Amino acid sequence: MSPSLPARAVALLACPVCAAGLTEVGGALVCASGHSFDRAKQGHVTLLPPGGARHDGDSAAMVADRAAFLGAGHYAGVTEALAEAVLDAGEPETVLDLGGGTGQHLAGVLDRAPGAVGVVLDASRYAARRAARSHPRAMAVVADSWSRLPVGSASVDRVLVVFAPRNGAETARVLTPHGQLVVVTPAAAHLGELIGPLGLLSVDPDKTTRLADSLEPHLVPLSERRREDVLVLDRAAVATLVGMGPHARHLSVPELAEAVSRLPERVPVTVAVDVRTYGRR
């Protein structure tokens, strides 16, 4: 039988049907109205709204590539920059990772915040299965970031969004009065060496404007910093990197394999991200 979920993490959650609080009873999360949500054998819980999610999230193959690439430590610098931004305002007690995938970025934050508990929310059940095992003080939930989040109002000290969609209104609702949102987005130079040779999508030049438009009606910008590292990757790592992200939706497996085979055996790849923090209005 799976161990109990972190009680303080469960306390953050809310029923996706009636928004009441949830408690763990046996192998399920239950609200006072009797709505019950079973815990999967892999450890995660599904808290989708009536009607389900608007999309299924990342595929099993994309999630496997992400777990392999992040597990190899290639994005350690991104996690470090994220954790620094999280801790700038003091150590949080509660952390919510929206679109958190396999939970590896959240795990890095929790390692640096020993008093905190965390919840990964992701639309992909494949990601949630891995995130459920990502850290002893974390739990994983399958949820839709574009609907009302299954999280209590004013309950979370930090919300993380790393290369994932942002729901400004719901983020503002779930943050505590002095809580902060930490957003990581790709900078213009991100993966620049691979865009031409592999036919990847370039970073949208209007990304900063779109970010402000989506968040600033609900949240106040507080800080901004950039982290840039240059990795040296072999072809297998490049294929995994491309396979884990949005580029995988635009390239078939044979197309990607052929393009990667034309690269040098080892390739310098720039990882450039902007890390921004926001507070409640």
Name each model feature, range by range.
Residues 94-97, 101-148:
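Class I SAM-dependent methyltransferase SAM/SAH-binding core
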